[in-house]
């Protein structure tokens, strides 16, 4: 999408240089704003994470004293307040973005409708307006039979574009909904302009004037129809009474040729009255039929209005549910991201601690090994020095005399010496071991 956008604008940059510069500047501002917001969110999350880690470290070696418990409670409240503040800020940002998205969608829809109306041309627009106006026709028979207020109301609808005042049904429905919410106060017009981006404030004011006149004429029409129905019912009752009187009068027979001209004239008058009563009855029936048709049309319009209101409420409920679901999913996603980041940070911290411990253990073993090797080398050197000194002490130059092997040793000579008696008493005999044969005579 970005590639297509840049290729399109680069191809036509000479034709739309000013517009492209404006769009490029706006895009750069939005990019910088997103980066700043991302950095701010990361900073807040990092601060919350550091506070959580600090609390975890405090909980490792803790003594259950009142001061320590109070300190831990304050830390937990601080972390909870920070998390709640972060959630509230994000919720407000999401609501603002959703409102901007709705406004943008409404603007796009309004622009699309305008473009479609431009594409259709003036002839199609006139046909559509005539189709709207044709929903409330006023024929000559109706003008002669219906009350003046009803005819005036129908003419008003025909001249102003139907029951929506020339607006489309959705715009008029939103207008009525906002107006009813504010109970007709003038402050509702600004909100209508926000909900209907395709309409200006002047158009909304003109539509409000039309709608006030529409309500006034409609109320007069209802009152007039009610009065008209009452009068017609009274006339109908009078005609029925007259008809009953006429029916009770016997019709003239052909066998009575001797009746006087005065009686025949009176009979003709009665017949004429009966015919006029029948014509009035037919006229009343036709008027009642037209009134019934009007009632049916009004009831149909009310049903359609109620159905549109119901659909609008359902749409609002669906949008509200969708919004809540989206916010909940976004909150869960952020919470999951924070949890994953915390777990990753904890794993990195644990891995770093384990790595440092292993390195320290290996370094200690290496030091012990080096010390042991040095001790062995020193011991070996010391032993070598002692041997050297010992060799220096006992070393003597002796001439070689192989015959000394056959000579008796000094010890042997001392043993073989004959020692005479030293006293007058007898000498004890001291036994000696036998001399080996190979030593005898030496």
Swiss-Prot record:
Residues 245-272, 289-312, 392-442 are annotated as: Disordered. Keywords: Coiled coil, Cytoplasm, Cytoskeleton. It is found in: Cytoplasm, Cytoskeleton, Microtubule organizing center, Centrosome, Centriolar satellite. Residues 23-116, 217-249, 281-400 form a coiled coil. The keyword Zinc-finger does not apply. Disulfide bonds: none annotated. Residues 256-268, 294-310 have a biased composition (Basic and acidic residues). InterPro entries: CCDC148/CCDC112 (IPR039902). The keyword Cytoplasm applies. One of its GO terms (cellular component) is centriolar satellite. This is Coiled-coil domain-containing protein 112.
